[in-house]
């Protein structure tokens, strides 16, 4: 049974730890991200036999409160022979699905796999700080239809990937502020070539309009 469209399988092949999976509504980001999780845990996505992982790590899915409450993710799990209910799962791993509002509950989790859905890691608030801490001790990916409008939107993900130590380093290397502004206001970015290369390294585009 074919579980993925060709464009989804291509995206899985391009994905890596710390990437942003980009796709619009209906592209199947949830299913594709779970396929990547299975692949990272030893599953053969090309086999004609049922998907089977080898001692999969615990899975945490951080999503919107609406998606958590409507059980949208729960509907995707059985396709990969998984369940958040241990009695219904063929694996011994733990699956947790929760909202961004509760992300601080998982700040001390280690050696697990995180899927951050409808990513909210922009700015420097509590969600971002917790996300960066989680990223240091776990494997993770982000799902987003709109990954970033400006270069500063990418700062948390760049830090989580180890490209920069902190926001200050990013600003020192890439941001020029307006000189006579009453408050910090960005005038322009410098060394943009490096930013473009880093963004290309983490973005995985899945344009379902191109599927064949």
Name the predicted role of every residue range.
Residues 1-22:
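Conserved pre-motif I regulatory segment
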Residues 15, 36-40, 157:
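Hydrophobic residues on the short alpha-helix immediately C-terminal to a glycine-rich phosphate/catalytic loop
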Residues 17-36, 144:
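Walker A/P-loop
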Residues 21, 61, 98, 114-115, ...:
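Hydrophobic positions in the central parallel beta-sheet of the AAA+
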Residues 30-37, 45-79, 148-153:
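Conserved Walker A/P-loop ATP-binding site and its immediately adjacent core
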Residues 56-58, 113, 130-210:
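Conserved P-loop NTPase motor "coupling/switch" region that bridges the ATPase
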Residues 78-109:
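Inter-Walker segment of RecA-like/P-loop motor cores
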Residues 117-119:
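Walker B catalytic acidic pair
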């Amino acid at each position: 049974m074919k579980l993925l469209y060709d464009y989804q399988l291509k995206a899985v092949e391009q994905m890596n730890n710390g990437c942003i999976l980009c796709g619009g509504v209906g592209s199947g980001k949830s299913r594709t991200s779970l396929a990547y999780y299975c692949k990272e845990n030893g599953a053969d996505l090309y086999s004609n036999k049922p998907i089977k992982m080898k001692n999969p790590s615990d899975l945490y899915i951080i999503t919107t409160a609406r998606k958590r409450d409507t059980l949208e993710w729960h509907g995707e799990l059985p396709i990969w022979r998984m369940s958040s209910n241990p009695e219904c799962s063929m694996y011994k791993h733990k699956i947790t699905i929760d909202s961004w509002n509760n992300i601080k509950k998982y700040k001390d989790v280690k050696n697990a796999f995180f899927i951050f859905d409808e990513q909210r890691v922009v700015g420097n608030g509590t969600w971002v700080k917790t996300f960066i801490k989680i990223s240091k001790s776990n494997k993770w990916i982000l799902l987003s239809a709109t990954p970033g409008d400006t270069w500063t939107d990418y700062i948390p993900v760049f830090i989580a990937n180890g490209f920069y130590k902190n926001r200050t380093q990013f600003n020192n290397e890439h941001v020029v502020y307006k000189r006579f502004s009453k408050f910090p206001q960005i005038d322009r970015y410098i060394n943009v070539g490096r930013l473009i290369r880093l963004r290309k390294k983490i973005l995985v585009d899945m344009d379902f309009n191109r599927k064949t």
